[in-house]
């Protein structure tokens, strides 16, 4: 069985490095010289678990030698049909001479794992498509799928005694879910991002389009602002024809939404943390590099296992700071704030919304990427991708290049030989000429958000806004108002308050892209939007979300009334109802009654009972952080 390490014998218990041994269930780790089956050895050694071994033989373990010595690698694919992020029949260029149709990336990984002399076990977990559910009741199920994914992967990895895990997510909540699972099971781990979609093109608009175009077009359609360009092919086309054209061509194939929306925000941040292979976040789903990455991941996970690198070894404070820096540089989604807090909470790394604010105060915004810019992830891929950006930031001292990664090398070593950004490219501005001197994500506080709120303000919309409150209890009420055309430019500056959409109140903290995009499409630049819900990574404009405490638990947002004057200031980081003093708030509080729970049973009812607040990541297994 191999030479035993000093101080260890087969079956010895080795502490796995958790901060609190009672936080997560502890498993025996067998440290045997030259063997990588440190957890599966529990059920495959000798004849202690004959039933388990019989089942494994039945599942495909070929012989006794593999049973006793081969490590078990779980391959977790977050997949379902009906979503291009998960599109299954991918035609992938595997080399320069031929194509091969594969069911999914997991099959490539499994085959490559087996080539390394290990046992690959595929399993699946699920999510929902934000773009499909946006604006409807289905969106309430979105955020809680992050917890389902983390719970599912933790369950299978631990119960099946896997020695390592390779996770393959492809959509917004998928990625933080896999990282949270990795922090829980703390076994050798690599994430493979499913990859970005290519941009679409509308002949009637004569420009590139993407999923965000669909939602903004709806606002333009409602306010009679959607028209075809004047070209021979557009003669006689109606606004409805233009909307048809957009819907049919916005998503031309496989991959996650192509701007610097939530999926690409999380993928790039996780690469900056060292938890995926170099280039993973910027390789398009249908690129030949993505298929080759799946093959390389099997080699890399073996190195990770041999070196004994654990997710918590990599998920350091410095790694999270790298993630925050890159998110500010690229103009990433506000959802990143929520997910970074949840990931850090799970890994017991102290991280707060104040850390987000400090990073934003010192890091410039450089990327001309959608939704606020004109380029897409595929464009960044063509000029060097995420590693080229990281190389620039390491050289400038903005990213900590000493953090260890899943390659077994440091981040600086990973990007050292990567091409530098072409000085003539237009996507990433030089540090000397940023789009904005500080980050686009601001943490606001004030009498409407004493525990914090998250604003996405690029500067294009200005840095402060004052308007008259117009209050909506649920997004649907605002959607009805927008559809009726009752939000008008001639009404003056308006601050639209959408409340009771937080983690508990929604429940599920749904994204408000339907509303925010409709406002942009309608050209309503006299409007700011404030909510205790979330925004899609595709949202832009003067938007404030994640308001804490949320309205459903009696937060000040529940006490705002139509006609109150609200000021939002991204320079002082304040959000206040300026004409409502504390005495008036107390009078209103006495009259306020908590709404009945929107849902009592099922997965959303359970979620509403368990979930913590957004300022701590909205996690369900620990409402308050341990620091």
Residue spans of the language-model regions?
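An acidic, phosphate/nucleotide-engaging active-site surface
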Residues: 149-162, 244
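Classical protein tyrosine phosphatase
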Residues: 84
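Acidic, His- and aromatic-enriched active-site or binding-groove loops in soluble protein domains
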Residues: 147-148, 191
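Catalytic or ion-coupling anion/metal-binding cores of large enzyme and transporter domains
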Residues: 2-71, 77-81, 90-95, 105-119, ...
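Amphipathic coiled-coil/heptad-repeat helices and related helical stalk/stem segments
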Residues: 149, 175, 512-515
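A short, small-residue-rich loop immediately preceding and capping a beta-strand
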Residues: 156-178, 190-192
